[in-house]
Amino acid sequence: MAKLTKKMKAIKAGVDSTKAYEINEAIAVLKQFATAKFVESVDVAVNLGIDPRKSDQNVRGATVLPHGTGRTARVAVFTQGANAEAAKAAGADLVGMEDLAEQIKKGEMNFDVVIASPDAMRVVGQLGQVLGPRGLMPNPKVGTVTPNVAEAVKNAKSGQIRYRNDKNGIIHTTIGKADFAPEQLKDNLVALLAALNKAKPTTAKGIFIKKVSISTTMGAGVAVDQASL
């Protein structure tokens, strides 16, 4: 078992793993230990009251955070004609059809999000083995297959996050950077939880959001008292 560094020992000593912290206190604890030489991301893990083995209980979607994530996504769009011009005007970094598909087949994937208009899926469908494992395959459930590609580009550029539960029923995503103001992080977390509650499967019974923990890239998880949100 790897030895803990002095920093990790200090973090673990400073975080009470048995306690659910009031949100402002939780953020203060995170910021106290966010001492890396780069600006750390603030990540969240949300334990859901679902059975991930059942397809009708899986949770997947997207939402735009009010204060963004602290980084600007590079967006590739599969579309043509007037939609291509609209996508470029909205800020898309790459726009094309077969030509863009060829770039991707060659391994040129300098983008974070892929969006497609419905008529372009005949081209995108050929890229499933490349885009799928990377979580980049366009999907109507998260708004990345849409006739309104310009709006989708604007959402991606303005801090939209996509979420999907893992095999343990946990959502992992980012809600900002460690240098965000506490209120910005709180607003983003509240927006995410509201989106998750809206996406609750009708077949899920009992408590839906069971536990919320936030952490920085190099830090320990801090449980959040949901009553403080």
Swiss-Prot record:
One Gene Ontology cellular component: cytosolic large ribosomal subunit
Top-level taxon of the source organism: Bacteria
GO biological process terms held by the UniProt record: regulation of translation; translation
Gene3D superfamilies named among the record's database cross-references: 3.30.190.20, 3.40.50.790
GO molecular function: rRNA binding; structural constituent of ribosome; tRNA binding
Task performed by this protein: Binds directly to 23S rRNA. The L1 stalk is quite mobile in the ribosome, and is involved in E site tRNA release. Protein L1 is also a translational repressor protein, it controls the translation of the L11 operon by binding to its mRNA.
Entry similarity comment: Belongs to the universal ribosomal protein uL1 family.
Protein name (database record): Large ribosomal subunit protein uL1
